Design a protein with these regions (language model features):
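Eukaryotic partner-binding/assembly regions in large regulatory complexes
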Residues: 1-5, 44-48, 68
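Long, low-complexity, charged/polar intrinsically disordered regions in eukaryotic proteins
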Residues: 1-38
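Surface-exposed polar/charged interaction patches
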Residues: 33-36, 40, 65, 83
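Short acidic, hydrophobic short linear motifs in intrinsically disordered regions
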Residues: 42-61
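Short, cationic-aromatic polyanion-contact patches
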Residues: 56, 91-102
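Short amphipathic alpha-helical interaction segments
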Residues: 67-79
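A short, conserved structural fragment
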Residues: 81-91
Length: 102
């Protein structure tokens, strides 16, 4: 597990590179969660574009699947939001469709 101390001792560019290396696995995890939501919406004849997951649920999946700390999962989500890979409204997260899916 990655700890706060281990990350904070590295130079800033190394921290950013390490954080960016988590983009693809995190987006794959998010896509899997969104696919479940889309399937649920299809069952009830809902609009699949409304599929979204909560920030807490996404963080929990990152912690369980990729064994990162809660703090680091939050950093990954914040970084994805800053670069425009995801769209957040309130506590819900969607993929940014302009960027494209995996």
């Amino acid at each position: 597990m990655i700890t706060n101390k281990a990350i904070q001792k590295k130079p800033e560019h190394k921290q950013m590179m390490q954080l960016q290396s988590w983009y693809e696995p995190a987006l794959r995890t998010l896509e899997g969660l969104l696919e479940i939501r889309r399937a649920n919406l299809r069952k009830v004849k809902g609009d699949e574009k409304n599929a979204a997951v909560t920030r807490d649920e996404f963080m929990e999946m990152l912690m369980n699947e990729h064994r990162v700390s809660a703090w680091y999962a939050g950093e990954i989500i914040s970084s994805l939001l800053r670069v425009g890979q995801i769209f957040m409204f309130g506590r819900f997260i969607q993929m940014n469709e302009e960027v494209g899916e995996l």
